[in-house]
Each structure stands twice: as structure tokens, then as C-alpha cells.
């Protein structure tokens, strides 16, 4: 922005808005109008014109640079500050809080000018903060009134009051702003439309009687939306929501399309199936038996209704309508379904399967019409209660149809739903980027302003210059801005006098220098920027550590922290000028919630954001928000003596005051010498936080320095002027809260300090926390007296310990400093709560206080980085999500009220439709709380069941609309935004371990000390033993030096120095989990000896290592830099002998056998040594010479074995065997006993397999040697599995096969398929990726478990023992409280009458373990209802539950779902995605889920441009055929066929199950027409394309469909009976629509999505394969354990573990965690009376139908975790990844489609695919292309300017043309050359024929000749051209007369242009594409010029040809 434009900031920039100012504006407008020529007036809003300043927008706060507003200027019209409005009629008004409001200066309502007192008053009221508060309160009160379900009469008056207030508000707004004509008037703000409609509706409903009032009353709910317009942060979030919804449009279209296709398939497959029921037949009454045969003959023809011929008594219709004749399972509302195919559900004896009655679930679940099918599929896609649909459909149609569900779930559900996620995340990311960019731009603008400020103030500073000389000197050297005041001493911002400032500074200076002298001379050495760069930037180099936070950690250590941010929840709404970057980052910045010691300043942005000033303000004053935060960017390391003292005043502003401070032992300063230049440089190259340009660019460095000084100045003034607390408070604090009165006390204090601050104490406290948690987790029901007394004593002890710790810490630290630290406040809070709880222990109803003890668990976060990170992430997200949560709350509130108003009455009136006893069900909308619960349940994704109820009572349309809106708005958008926020706060930095702080490392220091001690003892013992027994061997001496190094290194590791070496090393964890970067063989990064020494000499030096490898701005590492993987291994071992590599990611290992034969051919035939060197060294016998004798024989044997094992066939054979043996396992189901032959075959096969595998193992041992075999994880797996088979074989042979242990071993055979893993490359890749993720998944899993532990213990406290109830076990009903009130009454019943039973709910909260299981069911929303009902009904221990007695227990579950389920499960997704991204970086950005082959496919997909021109199908010579050919190849023909396909689909959609005969006939004929049309298309194509027709895949497909359709017309009945109905194939035709998409420009987004799907397929296939393997193993395992459990709940005749197929069907269902509770329930039956342990199973020897609860729980939980969390989330990761890649691809200016289009056009010009085109055709060709490659005619000039190389015959190669055109689109750049080389390579690869393509490049000599020839030609030609040009231009001059001024210049340009072409380097002849400007002015008539060009080109062609000869 030009400087003249800027209003000078500062208080004097405000001017009153007067009539003069209005006149001035009018004058400016008039002047501008006059200036502007007429034609320009149209495009006033030019995009590049000036824009309003975004900081001065209405609603924003006034930037602090303007200073305070003079009091008389508050709330009155002022002139507009924004230069943009200088000629617009506007003015601004500022209120006390400095919020800007902008008004139009035109008269409001044509009456009130800005100077009218009425309008002035209205404005004053409008901008006043109280007015806003009043409106806010009104809205909230109004919301409370709206929640009343039947309000009392007096509420009517309250309603009037509300309406009155709203009307008043609108009137004020209209008076102040005007109504709607100008900008900034009332109706110009969309939020005001809302107000307007609300008020209008209020009056309309009041005065006009409109019938259905309740529907209109629901509009009042919109008032709740007004909160959004009142609270500032909410508008932005709503903006973001709306943005993401816009972005979703493509996905939505795609989703609807896919769903329609699937729904059509469903309609065709299952139409009417779900009405099949089991009908009792024959009927009971014997009189019906007459004439049954005749009945059958005619009842089952047609529709089975015609039977009344013989017996009139029997009415078939009535019979099948009567529900009592159907077979019902107990407790079910719907009759049992069945099917007529062999694998469908069968009816019990005495029943037949008949289609009758209505569909299940009130008739709403069906595939009978398209709309119901669509609903069913939508439900499938959102995975809500889909197991029910799945079971019904399979039961009615047959198990084979599982395939349909697999497709829909994997393609529809996983893919589409995750696409929505991906789109939302991307939209969010983009918005974030935009905010960041805007912030940077602002920063630049304000820098300008500041410089201006500085200029204005320079004069005033001259006086102060002398005084500040010293300090400037100092600030130059040490570079710290805090004490410097280079420029604005006498700043206008300050109200202080100069003198005061100077004095203050002098005092500071003296204090400073007393301790400074000795260091200062070192610091002052040089003022050069270099020293700043070296010392100064030390701070940001350090990575995530604020340099001076801990370096002198005095008791006041934490004052420089950001604790303040904890107290300012709304800080972003008023961040100040200088923290722009920070403001955008807030959402994800880690530090908002970082506690002091761990505030890791993660990245420059957040570091800059929150340096000194804790953002904590009393009220809305913001000039102090963070001036310093920008300075912090340049803050160099503090003065080297840590004599710093700082205090925080009440306002949270830090003042740095010099003064002696006691250093604690932990905070010793770094010895100067340690940080050598090399180290810093090294660290700079590897730490990726530093912004290099900041360091390198001198101007920005200077600017930064100057800014720092300006700011620090302002800082100091602010500190003084801002001390809000009266001084007496400080006095009080110093007197009472800092205890250092007398010497002896100080000694005591020192002692206490030594003890309390010792790491071991910390360790002890941590152990206490863990023990305390354990004690709390040990509570259970029923507990013995003794046990509970032990627990309570334990609790007292722990409370005592924690209290003591707190008091000792207070003594050691003084209360003032103790409470400066977050953790201490937290401790204090918990301790006081525990004490309070002890006091109130016996008060009834306060037992909940006990659950506060659980918060102690969070103290672990102090020493557990991941937990800390999780809490921070949740904290941050809650900050950013605060607004989002509010929006969500508003949405939930609105829908809850809407539901209550619309449907509440219907639930009451029609209740009998949905419940048998006419009582309101638990889920209803009659009152607000239940309505809220329903809406919440919909947000959890469970909408279908509540919607059925609603539709049944209140009508289908209303319910569908409301529920769909909640579903789409709430569920999809908000929850996804939630996820996006979580993912964004999950940058890899956060995962970087934050263990770089003293306090935090205390634990590890303690552990380190112990480790050291143990190592010392070990070493002594080892030395002793060596002295005593072992002769010293030379070999040992060799190892010694290395070991020494390790020991030294050990000592430094145990000191918790984390070594930072480079970015891409393997980070391993040593024993105690400290991450230390261990160098790989990348030479650049390996630490050299001197560095080691510096680490060792100075143990307190801490350098941090990010675990996650970040992307570096400094160098793009090429993969070449990594040496081979085995080197990595070696260096790992060298550097880290002590560390166990548990953290190492993917099993990089030595390359697996036979993987890289081509790399080391000489090695691949030689086996390696059998034993490790150590073995050989210790046991000499292992070493044999292989040169002669036995040794040689042995060596030859090994070589032979090696050849065998390495042979491909061997591997194939083994894989085949593995598959066979796995397959054999699938036969061992419950029917094996009856099939004797199979059983014996399997037994023999089993032996054979075992022998084969043992042989394989022996061969491998001989071939590879033990060392290789047993160091490979996959080999271990083989080894263990073979062992299992061996053991069971021997046991069988010895006759021990019936032993329990052996039986359980047999089940381990299920693991056999795992061996296939290492053999299939694809799966192995996925498994490796997974293994890499395991450490972090485990970490998060642990954290989640801790998190859940809290809820579990709370659950035990609340519900233990309260779920027991008394039931009548014959009917299964619970007794009413009036009958049975408690356990003793139930007992009495049992004694008198046997049918009662006191029973517990199976899944309960009786102990912590069961609590976890219950919570898992709640978190997966499966089986959660029963648990919730039990909890809500519970009363107390041994009391009979009562319906909804404990209603608000629902809230426990709601809270758990929000924190335990949404957060933690999404966190998993976050971790997994994050992890894969890191691993991708590690593997050089390649996709880790794909094998090499698949990568090739992937790359081919990405670059379809590798197409070469194909021979087009030649046009037939025959005239008639030719015409048809032309017709068929036109686009119109294609599109019309597409339209026909769509119409055909529509007719298929119209079909319904119960359509009339007439309708069926009509559809038949329509279908016939379509078949004729499609046959016609087929015939026409056959005629015109001849045999080429079959070269195109689509055509073959069409042909097959047509044939099938024709056959189907005639043989429809027959085919349908034996095969699938042919209509299905028509559906597949829809896929042809994909072809249209290319023709539609608007469909680009959808094509991107499909492209992403195509790209994901290989990886998804691998993951699917792995999932199948897991399912296979679990299915085998399930068959062997749960085949005989009792059939109840989820296990029945079709869904069970009896056979392999059934197990797979069940497991597929649980993959999405659907219905696992039902399958688990029967397995939890452990004994009578739930099941019968002695039940016989005919045909097998097994007894009993009880399950094994522990095995069952393990089975299901592990399967859910593996499949749901891991595999499904990997799916998500792949899709997100590919989606972003695809979006990037589609954003490029030239996409694959453009290249494809180029080749399509090319085919027409080059029919024989010669790859050349004649120069003459070029112009037409260029014109025929589509944009962006199109060069429209006239294009000769441009084409010539491209200077394309030609070969003989004036032909040009297609690549040259494509390349030149591409260059024209993309412009010249380095990338172009890369692209060109790539394209040429690709072309050569795809054209082995290599047509003589290289017209220019031959040998070097030829090249030189050519170059010289060309130079000569060009020189001559240039001479000719000059002549011509001169001639022409002279003619031109004569013609044009006076207008010739420009020509000479143009002539020069032309000559230059040609010059460019003649430089020898440019022989590739591709100069710039634009035509020389001179041509137009020089032109002779077009034709001549054309001929000249042509002849020139011909000359050139000849020249080249000659030179070639």
C-alpha cells in the first residue's frame, strides 16, 4: 500500500464526522466521476482495485497501533479510518471495547441524517456493550422458555415481552443503519434477515389464525440462531461449515449416484423378498384339510388369491393376513423371515415359506420400491443398525448375497463416507492456509506502518539518543531487545514523560551492569549481524525449547511462560497486531494448553505467538496483548549471565527486572564453549524449525532488529502504564506469600527444597499415583469387609502422602511461586478435594466426590509425554472446538425443540402404534430432555430406529425431513469438522516427545541413576568373572574401545541428553524411553568424535530430537544419499549398543532372503555363516574349514540347499502347501464327525503338511545358517507354527490328544495362514507399515485406556451391584417395583415359587474389567442401549430397578461418548494417518502400501500421458458403411446413447413389488423398445466398425448385455429360476456414464474423486487381502471355540460359528463393529441356568452349550481393535492420501485429459500413426485442439515462432508439437525441461520401433557441423530479413506518414527476437512462443507473409537435410 494512503496511526488519527467531512466525501466522489471516462463506469468493482483493509472491517477490534480512544470520541460518528472508504459515504463508530461499527452516511429511512439526534442516540445504544448483553440474555431466557413441553398460561405474556425486545432491537438497528438501500444498512447483513423473519413470524402467528400453529411456533426456534450473530467467534465457524458444505457438493452428487446404482441393484435382487414369512401350514383345524390339493393348484398360480372354488369356509386372504399364523421368535415384533433358496433361512417344522403380510420394522425396511431401497442403502452406507438389514436380507435371499453387502460396505460406506471426511479436512486445511497467508500479508503492511511511525518519531528521539547509546550498543551485540531502545523512546503512544523513562532505564542499567561486567565484554565484541546470527538465533535453532525458560530456572522459572492462556478462553477474538501468524495457528498451536514446564515452542509460528505476554486480561483492553510476540521472532539468547528477575503483575504482563536471582542446581547456564559454531551449524541443518530466509536475508534481519527494539520499548511503557493491581497487592504478595524471613528458616527451606525437588522423590510420587490408581481400580462388587477396609486405609495413606508433598513443596517454593505453576495448582486442587471428601465422607449423595480422586491419574501426564500430548490436543481442540461445540449445541438445541414442538403431541396420542402397553417408549420427543437425547443419538449415527418410531406416530414426510437434516447437518458436517480439527492439531510435531524439560525428566533422571548403578554393578561383576575364569582373549580387547565409547554415551543418555543427529535417521528408544536419534550411514549427519566429547563433558546440554521426521525446507534429500539398508543396521549397532530397537519403525532389517539378488550377484549363491561371531569365538568347535574333507562336503551340501531354497519353484510349492493346509482347517466344522472319509483324509493331510514344513525348515537351517534364520522375524513365525504342528503330532502319536493343553494347542493351528503373509508381497507391505505404526498406536491405546479407566472407575462407583433385578424366568419379564422392591422380597418369591430369579445384566459395571467392556460397547454404539437402560433404571444395591428412576445418568453416557468415543476413536484415526504420512516421508514419499509392481501401475495411472498416437479405426471404403461410420463416431451419437441408458434406468426405478398387471405390461413394452434401440446401436456399430468393434472393451460388454437381454425376453422365467435376473446387467450399463463425464466440463470434481478411487485400488486391495486373512484366522478360531454355544440373541441358525461360511458371515458383520454385542452375549453364558453344560449334540462327542466368557471377550475385542481400528483406518489413510494427490493433479493447468485430447485429435490428422504430421497441416491441427492447448486461427505466426524441428518431408514429430504447446501453456521454466526429458523417455519406451525421430542429434561432430551450418544460414537469413524489414518499414513509414515514431523500436525488437534464435545453444529450436510484436506492424498481406514463412521453413528443412548428408 502506498504510504500516502495510510492514515497516520495513533490517537490523533480520529476525527469527528461532521457535515464538512460529508461534503468533502461528496466532492471527492464528484471529482472521481468527472475524472473517469464514460466507458469505464461499468466495471467499477474491478477485482484488482483497492480492497477494504481487513483489519478495519466492521466488527473487528481497532488495531492497537491507534492507541486509546479519547473518551469524548467513544460512541460518536468518526471519519472512516480505512482509506478504501475515502470516497464512499460511510463513517465509523467505536465503542468502549474499541469494536468498529461502520454505518452508511446517507439519511436512514430518507429522514435521519447522521447528525440527527434520534439517529445519534440509536447509534449510541446500538454500539453499547450492555445492549448486546441484553439481547444475549433475552435470547437465552427465550430458549429456556422454549424447552417447556406444556408451558403455563403466564408464559404468553413473557412471549409478548420477548417479541417486544426483539422489535425494539430491530427498530434501533433500522434507525441507526437505515433499512436496505445503501451498504451497511439493516437488510444488507444476512444475519439481520434472520431477525426480520423471526419478528415477522411472531406477529403473523399472533394476529392471523393460520390453523396448524405448532408448526409455525417451531419457527421461533430460529431465535436460537441469533446467538450466532451475537457471539463473534461463531460467525467464522458457521462460515467454515458453509464452505465445507459447498465443497461437499461433488461428493454428495457422487454419493447419490452410487447409492442410486446400488439401490437399483438391490431393487432388482431383493424386490419383495423381505415379505417372505413362515406361515403355519397345514392349518390346525382338521376341517381345512379337505381339498388341499385343489387349493394348492390354484392358490399358487398368479397371486394366490383366487381360492374359493370348493370350500367357501376357508378364506386364504384372511388366513395369511392374520398375524397369529406366522412364526414369531420371542420378544420380536416381526415374524421370522425365510427364503426359498437352499442357502436362505429355513422355516421350522409345520410351517411353509409364503410371501405375505407387511415388511419388517413397521414396513419401512424393504427393497420393494426404489425409494425404500434407497433408504435401505443410505442406512447401509451410514452403517446404522445395518446388521439387522444384513441378517434379514441374507435370511430371505440367501447367504451368497453377502457379496452385495461386501461391495456396498467397502465401496459405498468406507469409500464415500471417508471421502466426505477427506473433503472436509481439505476445506479446513485450505481455510487455515488462507488465514496464514492473510496474516503474513498483514504483517508486511504493518511493518510498513511501523517504519512510518518510526520516521515520524525520529525527530523526537534525538534528545534521548545520548542516554540510550550504551544500551543500543548492548542490544547490537547481545541482540536482546528487552533492554534496548533503539528508536522510539519518546513514542507518541506513551503518556509517560521522557524523564521518567530515562531514569527507569538508568536504574535498570546499573542493576544490570553490576552483574554484567565480566560477561559483557565478551558479548560486546562485535555488532555485526553475524554475531546475532550465531548467538541470537540460538533460540530458534533449539527446536522446541525456549532458551531462557529453563536455562536459569530460578524459583521464578515459569514466569516467562504462557500460563496466561489458560485463563483466556476467548483469546483469539482479540489477538493484537503482532501476533497475526499466531492467531491463525491458534487452532492447532500446541501451546495453548501447554503447562509451563512443557511449553514446547513447537514451531516458529506458535513460538512467535506467545512469547512473553501471557494473554490474560481482565477486560477487553487489548493494547497489551502481544506486542512482544513478534519480537520474539528475533529474540536472541538472553544476556549470558542469567541474572534476570521477572514478575507478573495481576494483568499477566511480564516485567523483566534485573536483579540477583538464585540459580537452582538444575538451571546452570551452559558453559560458553560448548555450543561450537559447527554444532550450531549442524543443528541448523537438521532442525527443521528455523526459517532460513530469516537467517540469511540481511534486510529482514535488520528490520527484525529494529522492530524488536520498537516493540520492547512499547512493552516497557505498557508494563508500567498497565499495572492494574494497586501496589499494595504486590506488597502483600511479597510479605505474606514469599517466606524468607530468618536464616534458620532459610536453611530448613533449603533442606526441604533438596528433598522435595530430588528426582527420586518425583519417582516415588509417580509410583504412588500409579498405586493409588490401582487401589481405586480394585473396587468391585461384592467386596469383603476386610478388602474394603484395606482400600479405605490405602486411600487415607495416599491422601496423606499427596498432602505432605503439597505442603513440603509450598515450604520449599513459597506459595507465591508454588502457585505460578500449572501442575502445582492442579495438585493443590486435587489435594483439597480429597481432604474435603474425607470430611464429607458420610454425607449421603456426595459419594461422587470420590470420583474426583481419579483426576490424580492425570498427574502422570507430567512424566508421560503421550498422555501430555493427548491432553494438550484435547485442550487445544476444545479451545478451537469451543466455538464449534457451541454451534453443535445450538444445532442440537434447535432440532430438539423442533422435534418436541412438531412431534411431541403425536408421540402422546399415537403411542399405541409403537408400544404394546401404550406407555411412552424410552426414546420419544414428548419433553425436551428426551427430545435432546434422540437428537444426540442421531448425532452418534443411530437414527434409523428412532426414525421408524417417529414415522409411525407422526407421518413419514416430516420425520424423514427432520431426521435427514439432523443426520446430514449434524453428523456429517460437524463431526467431520471435529475430526478435521483433531487432525490439524495432530501435526507430527506434537507427537515429538516433549521430554526436554528438567521437571519432566526428573523421572527419567531417577531411572537413569538407577540404570547407572545397575550398570556399574554389572560391569564390576563381569570384570570379576573375567578375571576369575576366562582367559583374556585378543578378541575381547578389540571390542573394548567401542564399548568404552558406549559407556560414555550411556552416561550421557542416562542424563537424558537426547542427541540430535539429522532428520532421517531411525529414532530408537533406549531402555527408558528417551528418544535418541541414532545416526544411519548418511555421512552428512553422523556425529563426529568432537561432538561426542562435548556431549560427554557437558552432561546438562540438552538437544531435542523430533521423533517425527519433518519435511525440511533446506535440502531435498535424494534417496541416493541413503546407503543400503544393511549399512543402516550396522551403524545402528555401532552407535547404539545399549538401545533395544523396539521403536524402530518398519522391519527394515537386513534385506530379506532372495529379495535383492540382482544387487549382489556374487553373494546370492553363497550361504552365510551358520553361527554368529560370538558363538564361534566362544565355542571353537563351531568353526570348521570349508576347504577340505568333511568341511567341504558340508559346504557343498549347504550350497545345494541354498540353491533349492532360493529357487522360485520351491517358494511357489511352499505357498501352495500353506494355502492347502489353511484350506484344510476350514473343513473342521461341527459336521466333521458325520463325514468320516473327509475326517480321515484331513488327518493324513495334516501329517503330510507337517512333514513338508519340517523339511522346509531343516532345508532353510542348512542353507541360511541359524544366524540368518533366527534373526528374521518371518522365519521365527514359521518356526513357531511348525512347532505347534509338531507338538500336536507327537501328542496324537502318544495318545495324549484329549489333554486340555493339547486341545488348546490345536486351536493355534488357526495361525497357519499367517505364514502366507511373508510370501505375498502385497500383504507383507501392509503388515510392515502396520508394524511401523504399532509403537504409536500402542502409545495412544494406552493413553485411551487411562482415559477410559477414569470413566470405568466412575462407572463402578456409580453402578456397581445396582444392575441386579428380579425376573420371572419363564416369561423373561421383570417384576414391577410394587410387586418386588428388593433382593429379600425376590428371595422370598424364589423360595415360595420357582419361576423368579435375581439376575444381573450380562455386561455391567461390577468391576473395572467389566466396566471396560461396557464402555467399549457404549463407544461402538453396539449393545449400549441395554447398559444405558439398566443404568437409568438403577436405584441402589439390592433394590429392584424402577423405570427411569435415575434419569440423569444418561448424562454420564453422553459425556463419555463425547470424550471417550468421539475424541479417543478419532484420535486413533489421527495417529494412524499421521504415522503413515511419516513413514511415507521416511521411504522417500513412496506409498507404503504397495509393492513395486503396483507402484508401476499406480504411476501409469497417474501419467496416462504415456499414450502414443494410436492408429484410429480406419473409415470403411464402402459409401454406406462410411456414412454409418461418420454417424456412429460423432459425439452426439455417444451422448444420445447415454441419455437412453439413463432413461432405461428411470424405467427400472419405476418398478415396484406390488404393481398392477397393467403397469407390468407397460414396463414390458417400454423395455422392449429399449432393447430394440440398444440392439440397433450394436448393429450400427458392427456395420461401421467391422471386426474392430471387438477391440474395445465397452463394446464387448454392450454386445453381451444385448444378447442377454434378447435371450432374457424369451426365456425370462427359465433364466430367473436358475440364474440371476438379466435385468441386473442393465444396471451395470450405468458404468458407461463414466464415459460421459469426460465430456462435461462441470464434472471435473467428480472425475477427481473417481480418479482418487482408481489410484487407491491397489493399496485398498492389499488392505482387503490382509483383512481377509485376519477374518480367516478368526473364523477358524471361532469354529473351534464357539461352534456349540447356545443359540440366542445374535446367534441363530444362520449366524453362528458352526461352519466356516457362517463364521465368515458373522465376522464380516463385526468388521464394522456392528452387532458384536449380540454375538458375544451367548458366549458370556458360563453356567446354569443360562445354559446347560451337559447338553448332548447328536453326531459329536462335545457336551454342553456354554461359552467361555474370557476367551469370547478376548476374541471379539481383539478382532474389533484389529479390524475396526487398524484396517478400516488404514483404508481412511489411503483414501485421504490419494484424494489429496488427485486434487493436486486436477489443479494443474494441464491434466492427463488434455494430453489425451491432444492424441485424440492427432489420430485424425495422422491416421496411420506415423507419429509425424506435415507442416502444412499444423495450423489446422492447432485450431482443432481444445483449450488450454488450443491455438486458434490465425495461428501461423505463433506456430512459426515456436521454431519446431522438422525431419525430411517437412514433417514434425508429435512430441515436439506437444512439447512446444505445453511450453506455451506453462511458460518457460526448469520444470519444463524435466517434463520434456520425462516425456521423451516415456515415448521412447512406449515406441520400441523408434521411428527415425532424432532429426538433429546425431554424433557430436555432426552436431557441430549442423550448428555451424545453422549459424551461417541464420546469419545470412538475418541479413536478408533485415533488408526486407528495412524495405517494408520504409514503405510503412511512407504509408503511415506521421505515425512512425514506434517503428524503429519495433524493428529492433524483431531483430533481437531473431537474434535470440540464432544463439548456438538454442539448437533445440524452441524459443519463446509469443509472436514478435513487429510482425503485425510489418505485415504485407496475409498471403505473402504466409508464403515467405513457408519458403523460409522449406529452406531450413533443406539446409538441415543437406547438413545431415
Curated annotation (Swiss-Prot):
Changing residue 467 to T: Found in patients with GEFS+; likely pathogenic. Residues 917-918 are annotated as: Binds SCN2B. Residues 511-529, 596-610, 1935-1964, 1979-2005 have a biased composition (Basic and acidic residues). It is a multi-pass membrane protein. IV repeats lie at residues 1513-1811. Changing residue 252 to V: In BFIS3; increased voltage-gated sodium channel activity; increased persistent sodium current; gain of function. Changing residue 1650 to P: In DEE11; also found in patients with familial episodic ataxia and impairment of speech development. This is Sodium channel protein type 2 subunit alpha. Disulfide bonds join 278-338, 912-918, 950-959, 1366-1386, 1731-1746. It comes from Homo sapiens. Changing residue 773 to I: In DEE11; hyperpolarizing shift of the activation curve and increased persitent current; gain of function.
